[in-house]
Amino acid sequence: MFQHLLIATDGSDLANKAVQHGLALAKVLNAKTTAITVTEPWSSVVAGEMALAFPPDEYDKSVAANALKILAQVEKFAELADVPCDTMHIKDQFPAEGIVETANGRGCDLIVMASHGRRGLKRLLLGSQAQKVVTHGMIPVLICR
């Protein structure tokens, strides 16, 4: 059925549940897995006077450290589930775009992700990343709650 799952996470509790569901499904299907976390471009996160206090190089260091932490957690989950899993940090992309492009580029046939993550009020303004992935992706998407 599915041979290569892309599991997207932002490290939130709900995303961690989606990671665990994706790994469990991959184990049953004996499918390949790739887990990613996507970080947005500095220019989309920092605006106005805040840009002076949080320069691009500091932002890059901060998001890289956070991505490493998130992916280390995925690696622990994968080890506990006894499922091999490649991990990737997708930099300087909007989450939905990074997820869809990575799934296409790596030949994935299912995307697994949480219904929502850490985005809070910004999510209400920009719309759900999960909804964007479902709308713009060309492969099935498993949304976990």
Annotate each predicted stretch with a short phrase.
Residues A18, V45-G48, E97-V100, R123-L125:
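Short, well-ordered secondary-structure micro-motifs
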